Amino acid sequence: MRRSRLATLALSMAASIGVALSLGAAPAQASPSDRYVALGDSYASGVGADSYTSESGNCLRSTNAYPALYNANIRPASYRSVACSGATTADVINSQLSALSSTTTLVSVTIGGNDVGFANIMSTCVLQGESQCVAAVDAAMNVARTQMPGRLANVYNGIRNRAPSARVVVVGYPVFYQLGTVCVGLTATSRAKINEGINLLDDITRTAATSAGFTFADVRSIFVGHQLCSYGTKWLHALNVLNLTVSYHPTAAGQSGGYYPVFRSAAG
């Protein structure tokens, strides 16, 4: 999420607000000879997981992010992450696809949340009322339905054109809230609506990935019990007024316990 959009959250009181794979193509076996490139936004760069590399600057790439964990455990022949906090589908096309080549054999990408305005939605839902929150999510869902299939197709076509032989794994987003628990902060209606919006984006992304012949790695199931408002160990940051950038992003445990095993399975 973009830091500028989250900055308004500092006006709010800090409150606790509270795997399965869809296969377009069967994942091949991981190989030490793989040449792996990671694309995407803050969920791929590892915002919220700490241990950011100095070279990544404002992109905030973490050594605890799922692409870095894959590199550390599988040891592909080469690895490069160009995932960047705040990235949109346009940013992937304009600034990240150049990292791919005909020798790339594995690509991961998590993208779309900034296109539909994750950060703006959470700002609205925290700072305003239930009706404004629901309206913000409805507007984002309209963008998801009308704009995201085409935007995602453009990204996926760009990946295939630049890396024609690569296995491509499209990794989705976790649903933020566990429902039906006692939880302060947002209303139950707002939490359910936010979940509805995330589910829609994931479903649209899965369809687009499958149509492109890519593998969709769905992290929603594995995060159940670790969401905001759950009684288990949280794998997502709630609102953090001392470090707004990490709000609603996976923790290091969320990357290692949630994202990494799902991606590892999908990658082969």
Residues covered by each model-derived region:
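Serine-esterase "nucleophile elbow" of acetyl-processing enzymes
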Residues: 30-83
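A structural motif corresponding to the C-terminal end of an alpha-helix
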Residues: 69-77, 150-167, 200-217
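Structural recognition of the beta-strand scaffold that forms the well-ordered cores
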Residues: 35-40, 44-46, 78-83, 105-110, ...
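Oxyanion-hole/transition-state-stabilizing segment in secreted/luminal serine hydrolases
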Residues: 47, 91-144
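Short, flexible, mixed-charge acidic loops at enzyme active sites
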Residues: 51-52, 119-131, 183, 228-239
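Catalytic His-Asp segment of secreted/periplasmic serine-dependent ester chemistry enzymes
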Residues: 174-268
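Short amphipathic alpha-helices and their capping/turn segments at secondary-structure boundaries
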Residues: 26-37, 92-109, 153-165, 263-267
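Secretory targeting and sorting signals
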Residues: 1-30
